[in-house]
């Protein structure tokens, strides 16, 4: 989870988030190189008199600055498209979890198990146990197995919401009347926090998300105790 004065991303806990971080670094390096080149040219223009005729009308220069931006855009677009397809592609999910946004809480339904559904409200600050996080804890956590492909079906009962868990690289809009899909897979057990990321009313800030990712054996034990 995030910590005070953090400048970078949260630690990646899913393959998709790892790819997103690599893509961020890749794009940032390209932006840094372009910015450095532009600043270098500006400094030359300010300190040097550019009066040579070849710099005023040069076919080669015009060709370069026409082709080079196209190449740079391709270098950015290709890995971006790859990640988009990774996020959207899911053929045989091990589990399907349906999420509905409400003002101002989330409801969850494990569609593979008929009777397993619950609402998840933020835990009021006065009811927190020692060690729990203010404005991030909920009364019912979502328990899921690790290292398994999980399909998220996300929608809303009232207004626009956005189901977001930064460590897992998941951010999907919850739109009334529309069912959006996301892929979820974690590489290690843990507790992961998220929040609604779409302004949805007065209590928008009080819609936390808590996922508890456990090994498959522990998930099966949780199912037996819950059903």
Swiss-Prot record:
Compartments, record wording: Mitochondrion inner membrane
Record-annotated membrane-spanning stretches: 15-45, 60-87
Binding site residues for Cu cation A1: 161, 196, 200, 207
Main location: mitochondrion
Enzyme class: translocase
Ranges per topology, Mitochondrial matrix: 46-59
Side of membrane Mitochondrial intermembrane, spans: 1-14, 88-227
Record flagged with keyword Plastid: no
GO CC annotations on file: mitochondrial inner membrane; respiratory chain complex IV
Cofactor dependence: Cu cation
Similarity comment: family membership: Belongs to the cytochrome c oxidase subunit 2 family.
Subunit structure, interactors included: Component of the cytochrome c oxidase (complex IV, CIV), a multisubunit enzyme composed of 14 subunits. The complex is composed of a catalytic core of 3 subunits MT-CO1, MT-CO2 and MT-CO3, encoded in the mitochondrial DNA, and 11 supernumerary subunits COX4I, COX5A, COX5B, COX6A, COX6B, COX6C, COX7A, COX7B, COX7C, COX8 and NDUFA4, which are encoded in the nuclear genome.
Annotated protein name in UniProt: Cytochrome c oxidase subunit 2
Gene name of the encoded protein: MT-CO2
């Amino acid at each position: 989870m995030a910590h005070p004065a953090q400048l970078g991303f949260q630690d990646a806990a899913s393959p998709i988030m790892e790819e997103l971080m690599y893509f961020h670094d890749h794009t940032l390096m390209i932006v840094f190189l372009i910015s450095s080149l532009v600043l270098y040219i500006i400094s030359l223009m300010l300190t040097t008199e550019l009066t040579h005729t070849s710099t005023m009308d040069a076919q080669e220069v015009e060709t370069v600055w026409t082709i080079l931006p196209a190449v740079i855009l391709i270098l950015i677009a290709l890995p971006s498209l790859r990640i988009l397809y990774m996020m959207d592609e899911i053929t045989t999910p091990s589990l399907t979890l349906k999420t509905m946004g409400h003002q101002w809480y989330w409801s969850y339904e494990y569609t593979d198990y008929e009777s397993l559904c619950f609402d998840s409200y933020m835990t009021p600050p006065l009811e927190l146990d020692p060690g729990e996080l203010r404005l991030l804890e909920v009364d019912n956590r979502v328990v899921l197995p690790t290292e398994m492909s999980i399909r998220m079906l996300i929608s809303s009962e009232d207004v626009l919401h956005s189901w977001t868990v930064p460590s897992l690289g998941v951010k999907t809009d919850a739109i009334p009347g529309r069912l959006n899909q996301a892929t979820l897979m974690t590489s290690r057990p843990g507790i992961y926090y998220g929040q609604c990321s779409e302004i949805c009313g007065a209590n928008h800030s009080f819609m936390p998300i808590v996922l508890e990712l456990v090994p498959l054996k522990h998930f099966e034990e949780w199912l037996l105790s819950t059903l």
